[in-house]
From Swiss-Prot:
Optimum pH is about 6. Activity decreases sharply with increasing alkalinity. Has antibacterial activity against L.monocytogenes. This is Antibacterial peptide AN1. Keywords: Antibiotic, Antimicrobial, Secreted.
């Protein structure tokens, strides 16, 4: 999964 990783990085 990368949703969490992307969300965190986006923040």
């Amino acid at each position: 999964l990368v949703a969490l990783d992307t969300e965190f990085a986006n923040r």
